[in-house]
Amino acid sequence: FRDLWTKLREENYAIHPIEELENSDLFKFSPFKTLTPDQYETIETIYKRLEQEHEDAKHGGSKRERITVVSGAPGTGKTILAISLMFKIKNEPNLSDLRVGFVTPMDSLKKTLRKLTHFLPGLKPCDILSPSDVTKNDRYDILLVDEAHRLGNYLSMGSGIKAFYNTCDRLGLPHTSNQVDWIFKCCDKAYLFYD
């Protein structure tokens, strides 16, 4: 890729240096980015399981595992894994009828990813959600929750405690609940990406 980019710059088809491209949000979070073999295998395993469960459900089969935890050390590519999985689900015909959301408790990441959806077929800004956004919509078939270890409870809400309690009330949950409880209440299946 580096050689190709250098050639494109020499021919004046590309303006920016490769380093600038590699540091751009579109490059960092693109589902077209080459995945590691482990990431690819994880996506394929999850996708095949979802496909089978979806097919079984169409024929009256019961729903299976509601919660799946995908864990890894910080910086191992869980965010790109979740984005790539969402992109695949939204763009493959077998599962494209499912209502899927990408949840992040980090406002800056939510804003960045919402901007990027304009460049990614099948994705819309409303697909990228905060934990409270999830509670304001109809039920989801699947929620992919990035940075799930950052989801909060009433003790971590500070000045947002009233909104937190209002959300719990709206969902019929006790005030001692947490944002993970919100996620479970609002979807059939959750994938929690944890450090």
Question: For each of these PLM feature ranges, what is it?
Answer:
Residues F1-D195:
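The feature marks helicase ATPase cores and/or their adjacent C-terminal helical subdomains
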